[in-house]
Structure formats: C-alpha cells, structure tokens
Amino acid sequence: MDWTKQIVRYVVVMMLQVLLFDQLQLWGACHPYIYILCLLMLPITLPRSADLLIGAAVGLIMDIFCNSLGIHMASCILIMFLRPYILNAIVSDTDRLNEQICLRAIGMGGFIKYIGLLVVIHHLTVFMIAAWSWSHLWFVLMETVVSSIITILAIIGYNSLKYR
C-alpha cells in the first residue's frame, strides 16, 4: 500500500469536509459527513490500537474545525471499535479482502451493508450527543436518515470512481 497516496487522499477528503460539506446546509436537516470515508476505507491489516488512535485523531481534527467539543471524536472511536465486528458479520471470508475494503472486494451488497451500518451508527451518535435530549428524538432520527443517505451515496460514488 502506498501510504503517501493514502495520506494525500485523506487530507483532500478532510479539506473537502471542512471547506465544502460543513458549509452545506441542505434542507436544515442534512449534514453529510464524508470524512468518515477516511476511516471506513482504512486497511483491515492495521492493528486494533492503530484503528482506534486514527479514529480519535480524525475525530479530534473534525472537532477542532467544527467546534464540537468531542462529539466527532466519540463517534469516530465508536465506529472504529465496531468496524471489525461489522465487517466479520458481513464478509464471511475476510482473508480474501487482502488489505483494502472496497466495492470490488466485497461486492455491492456487502459494501452497502458495511458502509450503511457504520455511517448510520456514526451519524446517530453525532446527532444524539449534539441534541443531548430525548425531546428532539424525531428530529435526530430525521437528521440521521437524511444525512446518512447523502453520505452513503457520496461514499459509494467516490468508491465507484476510484476503483473504476
């Protein structure tokens, strides 16, 4: 794996998130967080501690730029903790994945399940912590659904273009 290429790609995705997607307020309830693409596409051969540290670092960077007091960090650590379990539940033979998780490696159905579950968990965590109240539950659920759909479509589009 070419780490320089990966790092440049992740910096570009993070910059797009901060400069473009964070400024985008679609319908007041859509907040696409494409930066989690960086986490979901990490090689599966990384040690578990590295996964969690990278998740914490990416979340911290987003918290700094979004002024969100640890919300993204908590959400990123959670999805990085759950990632291997979800991947093992979806893909029966993780040995065939080599190093990279991509559309081509696990097929469209598996890829959508993998991305979909982790994106929904991330978004639900972000919006629940931000609301910090059960009184806003319906708005949080609406925000989660709309934002997750847009984020999932963006990640699938990116992955389709990348591995064409």
Q: Which stretches of residues belong to each language-model region?
A:
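Terminal, non-globular segments
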Residues: 1-164
